[in-house]
A protein has these predicted regions:
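Short, acidic/small-residue loops that bind anionic groups at enzyme active sites
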Residues: 88-114, 122-129
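Short glycine-/acidic-enriched loop or helix-start segments at secondary-structure transitions
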Residues: 16, 80-83, 112-114, 135
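Structural motif
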Residues: 33, 69-71, 103
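N-terminal glycine-rich "phosphate-gripper" loop used for MgATP/nucleotide binding
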Residues: 71-85, 105
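ATP/NTP phosphate-donor binding region
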Residues: 1-66
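Conserved anion/nucleotide-ligand pocket segment
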Residues: 121-178
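Hydrophobic structural segments
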Residues: 60, 114, 172-173
């Protein structure tokens, strides 16, 4: 059994039914789903006030327990507004001492890239609560590979690809915020 800890640093979850279906699906599989109060929370287009959403992220540094899976409820917009105020030092220290498994994509990627930039912290670009775990029928490929990525030390890497790059190629490098 795993413990999922929900965070909602971005947009309000428009599909509440899907989010609660995701919670139910995880619980029926034997997992605990904590911090569900973020699902219905709303401030204009966001999943709460900036203070609430920032607190969701900063409190991860002191979250008790090991091997917790931090799962974003959904993406959208809003995480980038939090970046200058996140306690990166505390989050990086936590991840180095007692790592949380942090998973999401879309707008949540800004926070994941912040962890990478500030401390070389590895996170998972993977399913989120509402759109994936809460889908009417969860994609079996997504579910299988999510658990494989979290539980296996050996990930499949036998694929090869060849492609011709088209269009202008512009190498870039910059901070994700100022």
């Amino acid at each position: 059994m795993s413990q999922f800890y929900l965070v909602a640093p971005s947009g309000y979850c428009l599909n509440q039914e899907a989010a609660y279906r995701g919670v139910q699906r995880l619980q029926e599989a034997g997992h605990q789903v904590l911090h569900q109060e973020v699902i219905p929370r709303r401030q204009q287009r966001f999943a709460g006030t900036e203070h609430q959403r920032l607190n969701d992220i900063n409190q991860l540094a002191t979250l008790e327990g090991a091997n917790r899976i931090v799962l974003a409820v959904r993406g959208g917009y809003g995480a980038s507004r939090l970046l200058p105020h996140i306690d990166w030092q505390a989050l990086v220290a936590r991840q180095r001492q007692n790592p949380l498994i942090i998973c999401g994509h879309s707008d949540f990627t800004a926070i994941q890239m912040g962890l990478l930039a500030k401390g070389s912290i590895i996170t998972f670009s993977g399913p989120m609560l509402a759109g994936n775990f809460g889908a009417e029928a969860m994609d079996p490929f997504t579910e299988r590979h999510f658990w494989q990525a979290l539980r296996s030390r050996n990930l499949p890497s036998n694929g090869r690809a060849k492609a011709r790059i088209v269009g202008p190629w512009e190498p870039c490098g910059a901070a994700i915020w100022r």
